[in-house]
Amino acid sequence: MGRAGISSDQQTSRLFNYTILQLDKINAYYGESHILRDVSFTIDSGEVVCLMGRNGVGKTTTLKVLTGLLPARSGRMMFDGKDVTKAPTDQRARSGLACVPQGREILPHLTVRENLLLGFWARSDKPNGTVEKTAFDEVYHLFPKLTQILNRPGGVLSGGEQQQLAIGRALLSNPKLLLLDEPTEGIQPSIVDQIEDVIIGFKQQRRFAILLVEQGLHFAARLAEKYVVMAKGAVVVAGKSTELTAEQVKQYLTV
């Protein structure tokens, strides 16, 4: 059994490079307002992709479509080889899609440990006690502060503590793709550095893919293997970080 309770078969399948997510001409609306316009991009297994753009261009809306919170009016979403365009949110989560939203969505009246358990219970496999201990130990290794506050209600935590909890909870679901919506926003610099180190570690392990919504090019440049840049609800630039210049990306980030 691998780290964080990943089965040997699952580990083997992730060693090979394949497309874990494919969006094909996704269109989404709020009421009659056309928000996403023919959004198309792919993410490979183990890849770190940064979704970038100014405020209001559709980045968070894209994540809502990915998680099923907002249905696409047209287009197709393939996840891990299956068409999940019409799949409900809980089915997507069980299939390995985990999200840390901008608001973190920590349940305020549950303790830190209870919040973490919600992530673990979302797993699609049937882990035993050894797997549970291994998975929790890894989260505590990544975010040791959590071990000191396990019995505190989530609502009394600082922003940085809540972000660590939210990421830890998502990791316990054993994701194939982790969505992070501006994980460093409003967080103290020391926690930002810690989150960056965690992402770099997962990038090196290539255990799962990460889609990172980020506005800061400096932070994104240290992590991204691919950029997907949006403007006015559409993808305007997409490519490997080795193929795009900073100026090609920056022109769509500055006002």
Placement of each model-derived feature along the sequence:
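Helical segment within the ABC ATPase nucleotide-binding domain
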Residues: 193-207
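Helix-to-loop junction immediately C-terminal to a conserved catalytic motif
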Residues: 67
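Conserved ABC ATPase signature
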Residues: 153-157, 161
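The feature captures the beta-strand-to-loop junction immediately N-terminal to the Walker
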Residues: 52-54
